[in-house]
């Protein structure tokens, strides 16, 4: 199945944008990949971490288009990204840097969703949220402390949580950093995502609310399965 999509990524009230998003489409192989990474502001070079992980996942995906099932590719892409981050952090001297990640790959009529941290994916169908990733965050320390992520000093914490679903034409998939969903009530976000207006207009409304209420970078990918 193919997708129709739109993306956005803004620094918001922060000085720099440490979020990254990418979309890859391979129409001849009937698959696509969407990735959002949110560099961790509590560590140095969060933007570099997000860029490194996102690029490594996309490069692995492009190099393995014809091989392996989607779940295996997702897991191995995350391993490649973790290795890339480890190597990047040691170019001069060991540097602490990390990023969250959420990705969704669609092959034929199956979507494989993986995430580490508090970046989210929503799968919506017929006015309902069919699936939403659960944040990897420590409830004792609040939502600001993630328990699973890509971290240069500890590659083991980058084990992704993976889920698979059948998708249908008309399904909507939304990937975003926490700067989006923390800017509005959950019911408002999901209502906006299901608006029948053109995707660009739907995203414009979400961006407007983020501009007003988000205190972080905000990034998202909204796609419709066709």
Regions found by a protein language model. Name each.
Residues 1-226:
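PP2C/PPM-type serine/threonine phosphatase catalytic domain
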């Amino acid at each position: 199945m193919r997708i129709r999509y739109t993306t956005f990524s803004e620094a918001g009230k922060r000085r720099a944008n440490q979020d990254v998003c990418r979309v890859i489409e391979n129409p001849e192989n009937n698959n696509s990949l969407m990735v959002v990474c949110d560099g961790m502001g509590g560590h140095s070079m969060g933007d570099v971490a997000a860029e490194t992980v996102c690029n490594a996942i996309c490069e692995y995906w492009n190099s393995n288009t014809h091989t392996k099932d989607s779940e295996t590719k997702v897991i191995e892409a995350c391993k490649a990204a973790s290795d890339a981050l480890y190597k990047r952090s040691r170019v001069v001297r060991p540097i602490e840097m990390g990023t969250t990640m959420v990705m969704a790959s669609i092959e034929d009529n199956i979507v494989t969703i993986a995430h580490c941290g508090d970046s989210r994916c929503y799968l919506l169908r017929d006015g309902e949220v069919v699936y939403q990733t659960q944040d990897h965050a420590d409830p004792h320390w609040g939502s600001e402390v993630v328990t699973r992520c890509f971290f240069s000093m500890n590659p083991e914490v980058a084990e992704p949580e993976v889920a698979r679903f059948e998708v249908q034409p008309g399904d909507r998939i939304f990937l975003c950093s926490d700067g989006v969903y923390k800017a509005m009530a959950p019911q408002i976000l999901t209502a906006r995502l299901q608006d029948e207006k053109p995707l660009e207009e739907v995203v414009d409304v979400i961006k407007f609310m983020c501009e007003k209420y988000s205190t972080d970078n905000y990034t998202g990918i909204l796609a419709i399965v066709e």
